[in-house]
Each structure stands twice: as structure tokens, then as C-alpha cells.
Regions:
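Short, surface-exposed linear patches
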Residues: 53-57, 75-76, 85, 114-116, ...
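Short, surface-exposed, charge-dense and proline/glycine-enriched linear segments
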Residues: 6-11, 79-91, 134-139
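Extended, compositionally biased
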Residues: 60-110
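Hydrophobic, proline/glycine-rich low-complexity stretches
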Residues: 1-74, 218-223, 227, 234-235, ...
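Internal, well-folded beta-alpha domain core
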Residues: 30-31, 89-271
């Protein structure tokens, strides 16, 4: 995919999920930091059957933090305690020969040990960490709600910092601290922002096979942001080196997402 970085973009229509829906979740207070990397470097992490997705001649690596809220099984209610936690992940961008776009997770840090153990058992690279959300400025009365009111709340409030602090367990374990200040109320709708966030599934290696786990959600309400603080060791720990500040910095109050039935990817289809 190529395009004019400054041109407006159209958010793709969210896909219909193959039944059954196996999880309903809310991803809130999301911070997206992205750096360019070479397609060749990204290719070394791709599972069989998919290749790196490219925008403006580059692959991209992302550091993304958010609050998981009310995650539940099927269409049921959120699971108490286990369904709400902080997550910070490092991800790449993938594409199948048929055009299906997704993400490939290099790591996903979470602060709920049972969640980490359960997801690692099926091949998703979760890591148990201590994660704290960076709070708003002292005295801020911001209260971000679920649904459409999230966008309205963000659009009428003063700028506030939001970010995450990650400490993996162990004296020499990787750490990350990042905070951004959203530029409100102007929405970010450029092609790169859409390319990095309009992702409706993940590619991964599960039990010896490549599979795609689909999800669907409405368009992220996106805002550009300025880096307030950044000290990251998670990307390096995943095996990728980046230099300088991130080229894309975004904030979103959040979306509701649902996950559907996985499907296998034909490993011989790449070329």
C-alpha cells in the first residue's frame, strides 16, 4: 500500500465476523507509537503464508498501550477482574496474498497472570508484567465513557497526558515508559493512521500452523499526539532496533471489538 501521507483517507468497512463470536472486548485509552523499519527486517518475523504489509516504502513496528475493559467470552458479559487489565504490545503489520491485512504480535505485556498463562498455552506471546496507566494532569475532570460519548468527551476537554509504564518481572527484564499529549479536537484521518489502525485480525503461529484470528470494530476515533515521555526497551527485547522519535504518534479514547472463529492460512500461498 502506498499513498500521500497528507491526503484524507477513507476508513474501510468493518468486516462481518465468521460465527461464532468468541470474545467481546473494549479497548480504551489507546496510545499508538510507530517507527519505520525495512520490509526485510519485518519479514524475518512473519509466520508462513503472510508477508510484511508496506506503506510509503516501509514496514512499520508499533508500540501500543491500552486498557482492556469488560472482556468476556462469546457475547456474554465481561469476566470480573480477569476481563479488565492494562496491555502494552509490540506488533508488526502483515498481509496475505489475497489482500487480508492483519497484525503479527512480537510481544503482549499484561498485568493479569491467569490471562497470560491461558493465552500463552495457545501460542499468543503474552508476558506477565507490572503495567500502570499514566494518569491525566492533576485536577483534570476528564471522564471518558464507553461508546460514542468517548469521542465527544475527548473533543471538548483540555489536552491531557496519557501513557503506560511497563516493568517485566526480573532484575534485568525489559521496561517501557511512554506518555503522549493528544492534540484535540482535530481528528487524525491521514492514510498512514488508517493503515496502522484499520486492522481486523491477527496472524500467528498456532500448534505448528499459521492462523488468522479475525476481529471487527468501528473506526478508531483517532487524534494526533505529541510525545511527552518515551523510554522503551520492549521493541529491542522483541529483536528490532529503532532510532529516533516515532514517526506516527496517535491517541484514541477507544473502541469496542469482537473476535470470531479463526481460520488456517495456506503456507504455500506466499510469493
Amino acid at each position: 500500500m502506498t499513498g500521500n501521507l497528507g491526503a484524507p483517507a477513507v476508513w474501510p468497512r468493518p468486516p462481518e465476523l465468521p460465527a461464532p463470536v468468541f470474545s467481546d472486548q473494549r479497548w480504551l485509552d489507546a496510545v499508538f507509537l510507530h517507527w519505520r523499519i525495512t520490509e526485510e527486517e519485518a519479514a524475518t518475523f512473519m509466520p508462513d503464508g503472510v508477508r510484511p504489509d508496506v506503506f510509503d516504502g516501509s514496514s512499520w513496528v508499533g508500540l501500543i498501550g491500552f486498557r482492556m475493559e469488560q472482556a468476556g467470552l462469546g457475547r456474554g458479559p465481561g469476566i470480573p477482574y480477569l476481563g479488565s487489565f492494562n496491555e502494552v504490545n509490540v506488533r508488526l503489520y502483515s498481509r496475505e496474498p489475497n489482500g487480508t491485512r492483519g497484525v503479527v504480535f512480537l510481544s503482549l505485556d499484561a498485568n493479569r497472570l491467569p490471562v497470560v498463562l491461558a493465552t500463552r498455552a495457545v501460542g499468543i506471546p503474552y508476558v506477565w508484567s507490572r503495567i500502570r496507566q499514566r494518569p491525566p494532569f492533576p485536577g483534570s475532570s476528564v471522564r471518558r465513557q464507553h461508546g460514542h460519548s468517548e469521542v465527544e468527551a475527548a473533543a471538548i476537554t483540555d489536552e491531557f497526558p496519557v501513557g503506560y509504564s511497563v516493568r517485566r518481572f526480573g532484575s534485568a527484564a525489559a521496561r517501557s515508559d511512554f506518555t503522549v499529549v493528544p492534540r484535540l479536537p482535530a481528528a487524525a484521518g491521514d492514510p498512514l493512521s488508517v493503515f496502522l489502525t484499520a486492522r481486523f485480525g491477527m496472524h500467528g503461529h498456532f500448534f505448528g500452523r499459521t492462523a488468522f484470528i479475525p476481529n471487527t470494530h468501528q473506526a478508531w476515533p483517532l487524534f494526533g499526539a505529541n510525545v511527552h515521555q518515551l523510554s522503551d526497551g520492549l521493541i529491542k527485547a522483541a529483536g528490532i532496533s529503532v532510532g529516533g522519535p516515532p514517526e506516527s504518534v496517535l491517541y484514541s479514547p477507544g473502541v469496542r471489538t469482537r473476535f470470531g472463529r479463526p481460520r488456517l492460512v495456506c503456507a504455500s500461498a506466499t510469493g
